[in-house]
Each structure stands twice: as C-alpha cells, then as structure tokens.
Regions:
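Short, non-ligating residues that shape and space the ligands of small metal-coordination modules
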Residues: 19-20, 37-38, 83-84, 101-102
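Cys/His-rich metal-chelating microdomains
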Residues: 14-16, 34, 79-80, 98
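Charged, low-complexity helical/coil segments in non-catalytic cytosolic or luminal regions
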Residues: 66, 109-288
Length: 288
C-alpha cells in the first residue's frame, strides 16, 4: 500500500496550497491563486459512508478502508501527528517537545468524514486573547506566547463515532415512598417522627433506543478532563472526508484503537439505557 500524499502544489507557482476556512477553498499565500476543491459537498452531494464495526476490526493492511501515512510520535505526551514528507524535525503541537519525525509508514483506518475548520487564524487569535483576558490567572507561558504574536497552528483531532440500534429487556422493582409516624421520647418529651418507607413491587419490561454518532475522542495527547470538553462537536456540519481539508493544517493520528473506543462508547450507551429503564419502571425509586 502506497504512502498517502496530502500535499497540494499551486498550479501557478508550485507553492503549497492551504485550506481557507472562510471560503472553503484552497488558496496560495505566495501568489494568491485560488482553487476550488473538486467534488466537494458544495458541488456534489455525497453521503458520509459508515463502516461496519466487525468489518473494520478485520480490515487487512491492504484493505480500501486503510491508509498509510507518515506519523511522528511525541516521547513526552504520546501524541501521534502527521507531518509533511519533507519535514524531518519539528516540535509537538501539544506540548512543544522537540520531535524528530518518523520516516516509517503508519497504517490506520482512513477517515470517513471531517469537520472543517470554520475560523481563520485571525479570528482564533482574537478568541484566544478574549479568553485570556477573562481569566484571573493564566499560565505565564501562554500569556507570553500570545504577547509575542506567534502563529497559531490548527490541528485536526481524531474521533470515533458509533451507531447502535439497541433493544434491552429488564427485571427490576418499582419503589413507592410512603411515611409512617413513630412516637419517640427525646429529652423527656414525646414527639412524633415521620419515617420514610419504600414499598417495592416487581417490574419488568423492554426498552429500545437508537444511538446515532456516539462520539469518542481518539486522542490521548490531552488530559481526559480537556478531552471531554472538546467532544461536543456539531456533527451536522460533517463533510465527507477529502484530504484537501487538511491542506495547511496538521492532523493527529488516533492513539485510541477502535476496540478501546467501542468499550468507551458502550459505557456511554449503557448509562443511557439504565436511565431509560429507570424511567420505564417509574415510581419514586428503582432497582434494576
């Protein structure tokens, strides 16, 4: 399987083109040439193809769902980031650790969709400056980075999404809270104390739910508390994957494998199904 080439030279001057988030096209910063992305969703309607889970697990290295890319592994934070073929040394975009790029190929499942960048670098910088201004305490390194006006680099974060059509049978119990009055003596005085009791009755049934695009971040470069904060993407804006969207940006390769991601997604589904079961049982309290 050949190494994927995600470079897009300008037809006019030969410089590298980059994806322009503002107008969703490829532009050349050297000569100003503009090229329309061919077969993009705005010129040809295409549905996003999804993969069967079991089939993806069994995919062989030369299967069409696989691709070969050149990936660098950060020894500090563990990020795996794709780099241009002519780049031999750089720094990790997550932790700034110096990295020597790996010239060996990396096989992985090819992306099926992409959520294109929507902000230009100028807009992203303004948003970062506004965010820093609202903080009581900001890391000195981050403030210094912003003051120096260093260029921001956009990076695509990999994610898995899972669909599942579930039907679950359950056996449990429905609890109805009632109260009993008990006479007690406290400090020599007679008092009435109300005690909550629960009357349990058997309950059983069946619930069904279709899960659409349960999203699991496939990167471990960021701490988990930050990963959960970036998982709320607007997936209605997904486009069928084209490498042109990555031109001028970096793309992180996934470090959370498909099976591990499915276990996390199943945990999300299990918790929702449990809520559905408790709602179906009804009452004041539930046992499942």
């Amino acid at each position: 399987m050949a190494l994927e080439d995600h470079r897009f030279p300008c037809d006019n001057c030969g410089s590298d083109l980059r994806f322009d988030p503002g107008d969703e096209r490829l532009v050349c910063d050297h000569c100003g040439n503009v090229e329309i992305i061919e077969h993009g969703p705005w010129t040809q309607s295409r549905a996003i193809a999804e993969l069967d889970f079991e089939a993806a697990l069994k995919a062989l290295p030369d299967d069409p769902v696989m691709e070969v890319t050149r990936v660098s592994h950060c020894p500090n934070c563990g990020a795996r980031v794709e780099f241009d073929p002519d780049l031999h040394a750089t720094e990790c975009p997550f932790c700034a650790t110096p990295v020597v790029t790996d010239t060996g190929p990396s096989r992985q499942i090819k992306p099926r969709a992409v959520l294109p960048f929507a902000l230009e670098e100028k807009e992203a910088r303004e948003a970062m400056t506004e965010w820093l201004g609202a903080l009581w305490f900001a890391p000195n390194g981050l403030q210094e980075y912003a003051r120096k006006g260093r260029r921001l680099s956009g990076i695509y974060t990999p994610c898995w999404t899972f669909d599942a059509d579930t039907k679950s049978s359950y056996n449990g119990a429905r609890g109805i809270v009632y109260y009993e009055d008990h006479k007690v003596v406290r400090n020599g005085r007679h008092e009435i104390r109300r005690v909550a009791k629960v009357r349990w009755t058997p309950a059983s049934g069946r619930v069904a739910r279709f899960f659409d695009d349960v999203l699991i971040v496939a990167s471990e470069a960021l701490p988990k508390r930050f990963r959960s904060g970036i998982a709320n993407w607007d997936l209605t804006r997904l486009e069928p994957y084209l490498p042109e969207y990555l031109a001028g940006f970096r793309a992180e390769a996934y470090t959370v494998e498909l099976e591990q991601a499915f276990r996390e997604a199943r945990g999300v589904m299990d918790r929702q199904i449990l809520r559905d079961v408790k709602f179906d049982i009804g009452g004041d309290r539930q046992r499942v």
